[in-house]
């Protein structure tokens, strides 16, 4: 299949499926009068979002899964690499589904315990490494033009840290309408370009499909959001993004490409550390997007600013990689 068609066709199909089924999902939640419970310690004006349909990740994850499998078969790109990335999306999405379901059933903002999420994420990372070894892919990191060979044990620990860390980083970023959807589109587009230049058309197929699904989802997720992606969406996207970075062998570039996710996570770590050590907070609220909200920024202003940061950082990364 022509490389451009490989990008456009799955993206369009994922977009159409998402646009068709998200409104049905929204209608289902509204009829049942179920929706997201908003945490009380967040910005007070977020309380008006309480009851907004959630678990939108269920729709776009299914769209991604269906399109990847169909086009993987049609284009003969259904290789182990594509399957393991898709598996990470599904497994981490399932953890998010479980988490979101508990919140809905118990009508609270707390779902799975931290250790339960962590255990599931670690299992996914171990299976990812197993496929890596089976496919005889390099157990090393690309570092300033050099290969840093880690070996099986260190690479396994790194993969666990990377997959767990970025799935949670994306989850932390999902605090205002549309932010993660837009940022994930930018990140997957960047890695799609990298995969294209590497000739990894299976990874390119996955990235294109995710972009199409998220373009369909953001129509309903931008401010004011008609639906949230929930943990099912954010954990899945974060895990899949980390997996793609490992498969393209440009893992550390994700620190730049996904700088917004790193910044959000760092703001939480700094806030907690500062409060425990000094009793004072660095930010008005964390993650940092809430700090800007407390400073009077609108959600749209935060979205556009953070997306621009993401685009600039991705352009810098591509300039060094390509």
UniProtKB/Swiss-Prot annotation:
Membrane spanning residue stretches: 6-26, 54-74, 78-98, 124-144, 150-170, 175-195, 201-221, 227-247, 252-272, 302-322
Keyword Secreted: no
GO cellular component: plasma membrane
Keyword line: Cell cycle, Cell division, Cell membrane, Cell shape, Cell wall biogenesis/degradation, Magnesium, Membrane, Metal-binding, Peptidoglycan synthesis, Transferase, Transmembrane, Transmembrane helix
GO biological process: cell division; cell wall organization; peptidoglycan biosynthetic process; regulation of cell shape
GO molecular function: metal ion binding; phospho-N-acetylmuramoyl-pentapeptide-transferase activity
Enzyme Commission number(s) of this protein: 2.7.8.13
Coiled coil (UniProt feature): none
PROSITE patterns (alphabetical): MRAY_2
Pathway as given in its UniProt record: Cell wall biogenesis; peptidoglycan biosynthesis
Cellular localisation: Cell membrane
Enzymatic reactions: UDP-N-acetyl-alpha-D-muramoyl-L-alanyl-gamma-D-glutamyl-L-lysyl-D-alanyl-D-alanine + di-trans,octa-cis-undecaprenyl phosphate = Mur2Ac(oyl-L-Ala-gamma-D-Glu-L-Lys-D-Ala-D-Ala)-di-trans,octa-cis-undecaprenyl diphosphate + UMP
InterPro entries listed in its UniProt record: Glycosyl_transferase_4, PNAcMuramoyl-5peptid_Trfase, PNAcMuramoyl-5peptid_Trfase_CS
Cofactor: Mg(2+)
Main subcellular localisation: membrane
Membrane protein topology class: Multi-pass membrane protein
Role played: Catalyzes the initial step of the lipid cycle reactions in the biosynthesis of the cell wall peptidoglycan: transfers peptidoglycan precursor phospho-MurNAc-pentapeptide from UDP-MurNAc-pentapeptide onto the lipid carrier undecaprenyl phosphate, yielding undecaprenyl-pyrophosphoryl-MurNAc-pentapeptide, known as lipid I.
Stated family: Belongs to the glycosyltransferase 4 family. MraY subfamily.
Matches recorded under PANTHER family: PHOSPHO-N-ACETYLMURAMOYL-PENTAPEPTIDE-TRANSFERASE, PHOSPHO-N-ACETYLMURAMOYL-PENTAPEPTIDE-TRANSFERASE HOMOLOG
Database matches in NCBIfam families: mraY (TIGR00445)
Protein name: Phospho-N-acetylmuramoyl-pentapeptide-transferase
Naturally occurring in which organism (per UniProt): Ligilactobacillus salivarius (strain UCC118) (Lactobacillus salivarius)
Lineage: Bacteria, Bacillati, Bacillota, Bacilli, Lactobacillales
Gene name, Swiss-Prot/TrEMBL: mraY
